[in-house]
C-alpha cells in the first residue's frame, strides 16, 4: 500500500542520502559527493539504486528550479547501477500441485489458493472481506477494493490501492469458488483471512502463517547450539522427504523456494501460457503499466528454444542467392 511505499522511501532517504550528505549545505555538494554516496548502492539491487538515484535528482533538480543552486551536481550522474534483480520464476504445474497437497490442512491454504487462482497481491488478499466475494452469481468473482498494511505491527485496512488499475473485478475459477464457499460456511469474520478473533492479520501473524510453508521446504537453515557455554552457528539442509526430528509428522516435501509474490507471478504466467491476450492479462493482474505485463509475456513466450525453433526455421527457410 501507499503507507508502505512512504515508509520505504523515508528509510531510503535517511539511509542513503541524509546519512552521507546530511551535514552539508545543498550548495556545497559536488558531483563527486553524489558519486561517493552512491558507491554503497552499487552492491544493492538495481531497483534500490534507481530509487535512491531518483530521490537525489528530485532534491537537486527541485533546488535548481527554485534557484537555490548555481550548479546542479546531479547532472551527468548515470541512472543505471546496482545488481540486476533475480529472475522471477513461476511455479510449475507439478510444484503447484505439491504445494497445495502440502498445505491442504494448514492455515496458509486459503491464502495460497487465492494467490494462485486470482493473482491478488498480498495486501489485497489480507484486506479481502466477504462483501467483495461474490459466489452466488453465474460467474463468481472477487472485487478488489481494499488494501492491507501494518503500522507498528498492527493491521490497517484502507481503500487506497497500489494503483488505479488495482481496483477491479476478477472472475475466479471453480476450484477457488468451491474453496471460498467452504471457508465462508464456517467463517466468524468479515475478513476472508482472519485470526482466531476474526481480525485481519498483523505483520508478525502473517510471517507465522507463511512459516508453515518455509519449514516444509528443503531450504538451508541456520540454528545455534551451545557447546561448553559458547554459541556455535550451525547450518543444515533438509533432505526431501525427510522428517523434522522434534516433529515426525512434519515432512520436508517442498524441494523449491516459494514466496507469497510468486503465487501472483504464477497466476499471470499461467494466463499467458493459456493464450490470454496481454491486454486482458494486464487488466486481470491490475498492472497500471503495460510494460510490467509485457516483460512477463516476453519471458513466457521467448524463453524456451524448442518453442521458437519453428519460428526461426520459417524465417530463414527461403534459400538465399
Question: What is the role of each PLM region?
Answer:
Residues 97-102, 153-158, 274, 295, ...:
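DNA/chromatin major-groove-contacting recognition/catalytic segments
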Residues 46-54, 65-130, 136-138, 165-167:
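Basic, Lys/Arg- and aromatic-enriched nucleic-acid-binding interface segment
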Residues 78-79, 95, 128-183:
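Conserved tyrosine-mediated DNA breakage-rejoining catalytic core shared by Y-recombinases
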Residues 90, 148, 177, 285-310:
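Catalytic-site neighborhood detector that most strongly recognizes the C-terminal catalytic loop/helix
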Residues 46, 101-106, 118, 170, ...:
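Short, basic (Lys/Arg/His-rich) helix/loop patches that form interaction surfaces
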Residues 1-6:
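Short, small-residue-biased leader/transition segments that mark boundaries at the very start
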Residues 137-138, 152-167, 174-176, 196-197, ...:
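C-terminal secondary-structure termini that scaffold catalytic or DNA-interacting sites
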Residues 12-16, 23-39, 43-77, 121-123:
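N-terminal DNA-binding recognition helix of tyrosine site-specific recombinases/integrases
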